[in-house]
Amino acid sequence: MSVLGLFRRKDKEDVNKLPSVHVTLDELRCAVLQFEREMDNGINRTVLMKEDGSLDLPRIARYLGGVSDQKFYLSRETFEIFAEEEQSIPYHLDRVQLAVDDYLNETGKLPIVEDSVYFEVDCRMLYQQHYLHEIPEFKLYVTDQEMMVTHRQPVALPDVKAQEDHSYVLL
């Protein structure tokens, strides 16, 4: 057995000694932020990501007070964290974000559904033009923050026509 193997085994034994904890999504987000603050510049939460997209929770156990008994997933492109029951969201966010970026780079336009007040991504068009291999089962939107894709419907901007002043002044 190598010296490196001894260290790895010890790390696994230490993790097994930690209690199992049930954490909220907000508690996990705070733990991930603490982890990022303590890392060197240029290192972000994606280093916690396993191949299946889930977070390597034993690596942040010290911030949680134990090893979480749940599974959480991370979007590599948007850095958002999701509970296990929402694991399809980060999968689609990542693929659609890359497709939107590619489409924007090639055409100079955003792939938005025509007349969409919410900047809904036109996933059908991205699929038809081979930017996507599948269409998500839910709507996605482009935010005004660095053209990031989100699954949350933004608040609609007020309709300018509806706000026209139709009052009269009597003299």
Regions found by a protein language model. Give the residues of each.
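Short acidic linear motifs
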Residues: 1-171
